[in-house]
C-alpha cells in the first residue's frame, strides 16, 4: 500500500467543532513526524500554527494525501479541486450525514493510524463535467461529484427541455428541473426526487426528472460513458440555472444546450478497512436492522 508522508488538511470554516478536530488531527500527524500542509483558508483561523500552507488548487500537487474535516459538502468542494491531481482523499465527518466523510471524530486517531499504516480501502469515484453552450459558444463550465442540476432558479415556473443521449433524441419534458447524478450522488438530491440508489462501483449515470408534468416521467439509468445533452426550449420566458453539486451555478437562456459527461480524472477516496457501504446506507437512511434470527 502507498505510504503517506505529506498530508494536507482542509477544514470547513465557521465551525468550532471543525477547528477543534483540525487541531487534534494536526497534533496527531506531527506526533508521527509527518509533514503537514494546511489549506490556506483554514490556516487563517489557526494563528501561530507554524506550518506550510497552500491554496486548495495547488494542495494536490504538494501532498501524498489530503484529509477533509467537515461534512459531505466540504468533501464535494475539495473533490472538484483535487481529482485532477489523483491525490487520495480521506474524510473526517463533522457534518450531518457523512456518506463521504466516514470517520467519526471520536475515532480520529485510531482510524487515521490504520490508514497511515497502510490498512485502508481505495475507491475511484468518477465526476461529471458540464458545459453550457449558447449559439455554439461555451458560456459556463463546471464539475460535480454528486450531480448536475437544471432548475428554474428563483422562478416558480416549470422548465421545458429536450433530452439527448449519445446524439439520440430521448424525449421532451416539462418539469421543475432535471438531475443528472453519479452513483456517488444517487444518495443525495437524486434520491429525494425518487431516483434509485446506485452502488459507487457502478459505471452508470442516472437522469431524474423533478416533478415532471406527466406520470410517465421516470428516472433513467444510462451507461457511465454516455454523453447527455439537454436543450432548453426556445419558447421559455425564464432563465433557468445549472448547478454543480449545489455549489457552482450558471444561468441558461432559452435555446441553450447543456452537455454532461464523465470527467476523465477520478477522485481517489480512502476508507478504513472496516468500511461497509450497506452499513452506511442502513445507518444514514434509517433502514431496518438485522432480525433476531437473521443470516450470518
Swiss-Prot record:
Main location: cytoplasm
Name of the encoding gene: nadK
Protein name, UniProt field: NAD kinase
PANTHER family from the UniProt entry: NAD KINASE
Family: Belongs to the NAD kinase family.
Functional description taken from the UniProt entry: Involved in the regulation of the intracellular balance of NAD and NADP, and is a key enzyme in the biosynthesis of NADP. Catalyzes specifically the phosphorylation on 2'-hydroxyl of the adenosine moiety of NAD to yield NADP.
A Pfam family per the record: NAD_kinase
Entry GO terms, CC: cytoplasm
Positions of NAD(+) binding: 72-73, 146-147, 157, 174, 176, 187-192, 247
GO biological process, one term: NAD metabolic process
Superkingdom to which the source organism belongs: Bacteria
Amino acid at each position: 500500500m502507498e505510504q503517506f508522508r505529506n498530508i494536507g488538511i482542509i477544514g470547513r470554516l465557521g465551525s468550532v467543532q471543525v477547528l477543534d478536530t483540525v487541531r487534534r488531527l494536526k497534533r496527531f500527524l506531527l506526533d508521527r513526524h509527518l509533514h503537514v500542509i494546511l489549506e490556506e483558508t483554514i490556516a487563517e483561523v489557526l494563528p501561530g500554527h507554524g506550518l506550510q500552507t497552500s491554496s486548495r488548487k495547488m494542495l494536490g500537487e504538494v501532498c501524498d494525501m489530503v484529509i477533509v474535516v467537515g461534512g459531505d459538502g466540504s468533501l464535494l468542494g475539495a473533490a472538484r479541486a483535487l481529482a485532477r491531481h489523483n491525490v487520495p482523499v480521506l474524510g473526517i465527518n463533522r457534518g450531518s450525514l457523512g456518506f463521504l466523510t466516514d470517520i467519526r471524530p471520536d475515532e480520529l486517531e485510531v482510524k487515521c493510524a490504520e490508514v497511515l499504516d497502510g490498512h485502508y480501502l481505495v475507491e475511484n469515484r468518477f465526476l461529471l463535467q458540464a458545459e453550457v453552450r449558447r449559439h455554439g459558444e461555451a458560456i459556463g463550465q463546471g464539475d460535480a461529484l454528486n450531480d448536475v442540476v437544471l432548475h428554474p432558479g428563483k422562478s416558480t415556473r416549470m422548465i421545458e427541455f429536450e433530452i439527448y443521449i449519445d446524439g439520440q433524441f430521448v424525449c421532451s419534458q416539462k418539469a421543475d428541473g432535471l438531475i443528472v447524478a453519479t452513483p456517488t450522488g444517487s444518495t443525495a438530491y437524486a434520491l429525494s426526487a425518487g431516483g434509485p440508489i446506485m452502488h459507487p462501483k457502478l459505471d452508470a449515470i442516472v437522469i431524474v426528472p423533478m416533478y415532471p408534468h406527466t406520470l410517465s416521467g421516470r428516472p433513467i439509468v444510462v451507461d457511465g460513458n454516455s454523453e447527455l445533452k439537454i436543450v432548453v426550449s426556445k419558447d421559455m420566458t425564464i432563465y433557468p440555472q445549472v448547478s454543480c453539486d449545489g455549489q457552482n451555478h450558471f444561468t441558461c437562456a432559452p435555446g441553450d444546450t447543456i452537455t454532461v459527461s464523465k470527467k476523465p480524472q477520478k477522485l481517489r477516496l480512502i476508507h478504513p478497512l472496516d468500511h461497509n457501504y450497506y452499513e452506511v446506507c442502513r445507518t444514514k437512511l434509517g433502514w431496518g436492522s438485522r432480525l433476531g434470527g437473521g443470516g450470518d
